[in-house]
Design a protein with these regions (language model features):
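HotDog/MaoC-like acyl-thioester-processing domains
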Residues: 1-13, 96-149
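Short structured motifs
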Residues: 1-2, 86-92
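Short C-terminal domain-edge/linker segments immediately following a structured domain
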Residues: 46-51, 89, 134-139
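N-terminal start-of-chain detector that recognizes signal peptides
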Residues: 60-63, 73-78, 93-98, 110-113, ...
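Hot-dog-fold acyl-thioester-processing enzymes
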Residues: 1-83, 145-149
């Protein structure tokens, strides 16, 4: 069913597609973003310590999580004419080749104003072990019909 502002409630869940992370997908994101940081490409470099952290191998770009969340929100909102307006995220755990991650969201609140209607969504990306790898908050606008005002 297409999401409409009126049929949404706090607690409703939005599920995004699963994404299998591979060395190739990490490399493709490097190419797309022009970010060739050794964090994402060089296993030997990543065996060193970064402060108190040792990653033990390459990790996926955090912004790749951002893209997966954006895709989920856009695919959910667009059929209803809604617009993904804001996304704030925090990376909480590294993602490695071989992980399968999936974004999801839970509607936190909705609000109607004179000019538009807004939905606030708590978002999370989890790996195959159900560990959170990214968390955040998104805002989606369900514009009022301009012809009815």
């Amino acid at each position: 069913m297409t999401a409409t502002f009126d049929n949404l409630s706090a607690g409703d869940v939005i599920d995004g597609p699963k994404f299998a992370v591979s060395r190739e997908s990490i490399r493709l994101f490097c190419d797309a973003s022009l970010d060739y940081n050794p964090l994402h490409l060089d296993d030997d470099y990543m065996k060193g310590n970064f402060g108190k952290t040792n990653f033990g191998g390459i990790i996926m770009h955090g912004m790749n999580n951002f893209g997966l969340i954006s895709r989920m929100l856009t695919e959910w909102a667009s059929p209803a004419g809604a617009i993904h307006r804001r996304l704030e995220t925090r990376w909480v755990k590294p993602v490695r080749p071989g992980d399968t991650i999936q974004p999801s969201g839970i509607i936190k609140a909705k609000q109607a104003t004179e000019k538009s209607r807004w939905v606030l969504i708590d978002v999370v990306v989890k790996n195959q072990k159900s560990e959170k790898v990214a968390t955040g908050e998104a805002m989606v606008e369900f514009p009022r019909d301009l012809f009815c005002q």
